[in-house]
Amino acid sequence: YTLLYTKHTELKLGLFALERMVQIMEMTQAGMVYADRYQQVNGIRKAAPVIDYQFGSLRDDFDFGSVMLFQSEVFKKMVKTTKEDYQYAGLYDLRLKISQKKKLVHINEYLYTEIENDTRKSGEKQFDYVDPKNRRVQIEMEQACSEHLKAIGGYLEPCFQSVNFSASTFEYEASVIIPVRNRIRTIRDAVRSALNQQTSFPFNVIVIDNHSTDGTTEALRELCTDHRLVHIIPERNDLGIGGCWNTGIHHEKCGKFAIQLDSDDVYKDEHTLQIMVNAFYEQNCAMVIGTYMMTDFNMKEMAPGIIDHKEWTPENGRNNALRINGLGAPRAFYTSLLREINVPNTSYGEDYALGLCISSNYQIGRIYDVVYLCRRWEGNSDAALAIEKVNQNNVYKDRIRTWELQRRIQVNKIKLKPQKAILQLIEEQTHSWELAKQNYQALEEYRKQMKKMSLAGKDFDMLVYTFPNPKRILSATAQTD
């Protein structure tokens, strides 16, 4: 067995901890085992449990703890299969390769104590992956993840469905969707930010007031003097943020495009809505994601500043989306499609689930200029989460990834069936038909003479690749009887 310790500080193993890890390894025949642990922070010991590894646990920052035990034979074999010379993604690549062949088993027992020096709150750690100084790291992580997806059949080639925006008619071109519960300190700012938008099209603001009790409802009623504000109090009392979204997008007054605005955030200026809607048409996409700036309650910029998700690429963004923990904000959707999918009725990860689902078929548009201000304050639901809540959230997102990855693999299998049948037919013919065999062999040689040509017309400009194939001139003497 091979034990890997990823910290540089003192490690204190529990009584018979290594023996227990070996025991579980032998019982499960896992490729790797990892365990819950204690963390010592400023001299105080606290429990730091980890979570089970799932098929879709593709985050490169998945928390295994600092102690991992590997089967040495599996470890060496997977290292030998690695062609890339990674500087940063070596361990991530190794774990993905091992997961293709063996299980990664979580021992939910506290087997060691580690010294923890990163004492930042959960709300501060969640943006590490978009820090510009980590860009080289992220490029390697994306490469490793993409290779893993190709190996397991979950990789999607950059082919997308087009969107027909004239398929349905709407009274409004756009609707700003604001779910809210008990945000009396911020709801007026959010609604006014939406109503102040200047656009070339009609829009409205749909606020789903999820039974507020702090004066939010009364504040919204005061703002309803503007006829563009639609104030909805749901009949149901079991709705999360996703359920509130479903209530809004299925409302008869919802516009063609549904644009997010959280109840404690604001748009950067009066042009955000126009910019978001324009992007749908300019990029022919079913979902648009903008760029936001982190601010304090008074809307002054604070670290980490601008979050633009420039790791996204049109070609590989939807594959890399399975690795990263978020897609950005604000998010906007083509309402007709969103009504078909519906939003998971949760208050965490519902937007991420939509992004994965939509991107599997359609292109996601991007805006890299700041259009949104995300206010961080003590009232944020994710400002400082307990480890148990962080784990709960991560389990759910990993489950979302697992479901989406399983779906993508099934779709790829269906797509490959006709191609496999064609290749099988060609293989059978080249074995039983000598002339066909000779012609295919000759074709491979002719391909080596391929040339690139540029063709330009009145309305088009394209590159054409040509190569000679004189065997096509001759009859293949095929018989049809």
Describe the function of each predicted region:
Residues 85-94, 347-354:
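Acidic donor-binding loop at a coil-to-helix junction in glycosyltransferase catalytic cores
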Residues 192-202:
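Short, acidic, metal-binding catalytic loop of nucleotide-sugar glycosyltransferases
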Residues 105-117, 291, 365-371, 376:
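Catalytic beta-strand/loop signature of glycosyltransferases that borders the donor
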Residues 46-70, 311-332:
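A recurrent flexible, glycine/aromatic-enriched loop bordering the glycosyltransferase active site
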Residues 10-47, 271-304:
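Conserved donor NDP-sugar-binding/catalytic core segment of glycosyltransferases
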Residues 1, 235-253:
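Glycine-rich, basic loop-to-helix element that forms the pyrophosphate-binding segment
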Residues 10, 209-219, 237:
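A conserved acidic beta->alpha catalytic loop
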Residues 1-12, 255-266:
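Short beta-strand-to-loop acidic/aromatic patch adjacent to the donor-nucleotide binding site
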